[in-house]
UniProtKB/Swiss-Prot annotation:
F-type ATPases have 2 components, CF(1) - the catalytic core - and CF(0) - the membrane proton channel. CF(1) has five subunits: alpha(3), beta(3), gamma(1), delta(1), epsilon(1). CF(0) has three main subunits: a(1), b(2) and c(9-12). The alpha and beta chains form an alternating ring which encloses part of the gamma chain. CF(1) is attached to CF(0) by a central stalk formed by the gamma and epsilon chains, while a peripheral stalk is formed by the delta and b chains. SUPFAM superfamilies: C-terminal domain of alpha and beta subunits of F1 ATP synthase, N-terminal domain of alpha and beta subunits of F1 ATP synthase, P-loop containing nucleoside triphosphate hydrolases. It catalyses: ATP + H2O + 4 H(+)(in) = ADP + phosphate + 5 H(+)(out). Keywords: ATP synthesis, ATP-binding, Cell inner membrane, Cell membrane, CF(1), Hydrogen ion transport, Ion transport, Membrane, Nucleotide-binding, Translocase, Transport. This is ATP synthase subunit alpha 2. ATP binds at residues 175-182. It is found in: Cell inner membrane.
Length: 534
């Protein structure tokens, strides 16, 4: 065979292979929809040329920056930017993604500090997660929900006894600036240690120093092991502040749908409402009351309706929400506070006047309520909570009259003195949750008026003595705290006796009885000088 023929066969074979590969290759041509930035403002961009984009669709900008299509008009699209946008310019290209905003979920987020996009902020590397959920999800239908029947212990005596919270409830915390709203939420998270409850703390528009303090407290107390922290700082774009609570709720819902109990704290929704107002005004949406857009109620209702208690057929998990709201000059009838009060299942109001008096937590029992938590409250609490709340309400009413200097009868004075000791017992330092057994021992001692003989300046030490003595409570009595059984009279008397012994050293010593005078003890009156007149 000639060398030329061999070479020809080699070429023929090679070309035949190329033809087969070319015929087997089917190029997948997909249309790419590209738009153009027309203008940029604070936290938003106007984009033209994306006719197929959908509402809430994620769009991609240069530099791996994403945004959400918020206004969808024929002429242009208003996009909320989810990150730093200083590098963007008019004329830059914008791509559709065909998907909505989602966030990483799963056990890999426990113990981590992330932003609403799922990016780590704690310097511990990427978040380990293989599953993602959209940040906007429909709330569970009514047929999938179960009544709130299990208590969520906060570790705070005034709340667990008088304003109980149940798993699956939405309880609003509201008050003026610097009255301890965040402290109540953090104490509640700390008390979930050992309770098989996972926690999500969502900081919206907070100072970096305040968030760092919260994270340090959670780490110090060992609570970060079961907590995820979602953070947007005050200098972040408003778009991140807007999506933060929705992303945090999706993280919590993943655990709830797996049959677990979850607590989520929104700190605070005032900043969320302001961020949404800023975005709406920039996007030229019509303003309403206090310049908020007309759907401000809807953005909070659709968020908080996702908190619920699922039926056992759906896993039996629960999501308890503690939204925080800030009031101005104690005005709880303002627009956003009244919206949240009507959406939630109750509220805990913190009074600046109580805070100034040193009553911490500064819970105003008269203005606070729990609409569904009472059904979930432990039976042991119910035996004393009703009488205690009535006595405290009577005290607050009478104390107002006592300030005017009115003369009070003995019964009124007794009610006021008893109420002052109730208020002193309900005081509690920050980051110091109290166990159920210790709380019930203190409450029973209050109902039995064992503290009434204790001086007010000794109430803190006396209350601590009762809590310490509660550790000696019989195990069978402790077991009944977690059951639906009522405390028997013998159990109540045993607990009261433990408290009575603990308070013995704080009671005033009885005054010695004086013997009655006899006739021999009576001395005759001395005669006047000069004797009797004749």
């Amino acid at each position: 065979m000639e060398p030329a023929e061999d070479l020809q066969k080699v070429f023929d074979k090679a070309f035949a292979g190329m033809r087969e590969a070319r015929e087997a290759f089917a190029p997948s041509l997909a249309p790419r929809e590209v738009g153009t930035i027309t203008s940029i403002a604070t936290g938003i961009a106007k984009v033209s040329g994306l006719p197929g984009v959908g509402f809430d669709e994620l769009v991609k900008f240069p530099g791996d920056l994403f945004g959400i299509a918020f206004n969808v008009d024929e002429a242009e699209i208003g996009v909320v930017l989810l990150g730093e946008y200083w590098h963007l310019h008019a004329g830059d290209e914008v791509d559709r993604t065909g998907r909505v905003m989602d966030v990483a979920v799963g056990d890999g987020l426990l113990g981590r500090v992330i932003d609403p996009l799922g990016r780590p902020l704690d310097g511990r590397g990427p978040v380990a997660s293989s599953h993602r959920l959209p940040i906007e999800r429909p709330a569970s239908p009514i047929m999938d929900r179960a009544p709130v029947t299990v208590p969520l212990q906060t570790g705070l005596k005034v709340i667990d006894a008088l304003i109980p919270v149940g798993r699956g409830q939405r309880e609003l915390i509201l008050g003026d600036r610097q009255t301890g709203k965040t402290a109540i939420a953090i104490d509640t998270i700390l008390n979930q240690q050992g309770q098989n409850v996972l926690c999500v703390y969502c900081a919206i528009g907070q100072r970096a120093s305040a968030v760092a303090k919260v994270v340090a407290t959670l780490r110090e107390k060992g609570a970060m092991d079961f907590t995820t922290v979602v953070v947007t700082e005050g200098n972040d774009p408003p778009g991140l502040a807007y999506i933060a609570p929705y992303a945090a709720t999706s993280i919590a819902e993943h655990f709830m749908e797996a049959g677990r109990d979850v607590l989520i704290v929104y700190d605070d929704l005032t900043q969320h409402a302001r961020a949404y107002r800023e975005l709406s005004l920039l996007l030229r949406r019509p303003p309403g009351r206090e310049a908020f857009p007309g759907d401000i109620f809807y953005i909070h209702s659709r968020l908080l309706e996702r908190a619920t208690h699922l039926r056992q057929e759906r896993g039996g998990g629960s999501l308890t929400a503690l939204p925080i709201i800030e009031t101005q000059a104690q005005n709880i009838s303002a627009y956003i506070p009244t919206n949240l009060i009507s959406i939630t299942d109750g509220q805990i109001y913190l009074s600046p006047s109580l805070f100034e008096l040193g009553v911490l937590p500064a819970v105003d029992v008269g203005k606070s309520v729990s609409r569904v938590g009472g059904k979930a409250q432990r039976t042991a609490y119910r035996a004393v909570a009703g009488d205690l709340k009535l006595a405290y309400a009577q005290f607050e009413e009478l104390e107002t009259f006592a300030r005017f200097g009115a003369r009070l009868d003995e019964n009124t004075t007794k009610i006021i003195e008893h109420g002052r000791r109730i208020r002193a017992c309900l005081k509690q330092p920050e980051s110091a949750p109290v166990s159920v057994a210790a709380q019930i021992a203190v409450l029973l001692a209050l109902s039995a008026e064992l503290f009434d003989g204790v001086e007010l300046n000794q109430m803190t030490e006396a209350e601590q003595a009762v809590r310490a003595a509660a550790a000696d409570m019989p195990a069978e009595v402790r077991a009944r705290f977690d059951s639906a059984d009522k405390l028997s009279d013998e159990d109540r008397e045993a607990i009261i006796q433990i408290a009575r012994v603990a308070l013995a050293s704080f009671q005033p010593a009885p005054e010695p009885e004086t013997a009655p005078k006899t006739k021999t003890d009576i001395k005759p009156k001395p005669k006047a000088a000069g004797g009797e007149s004749s």
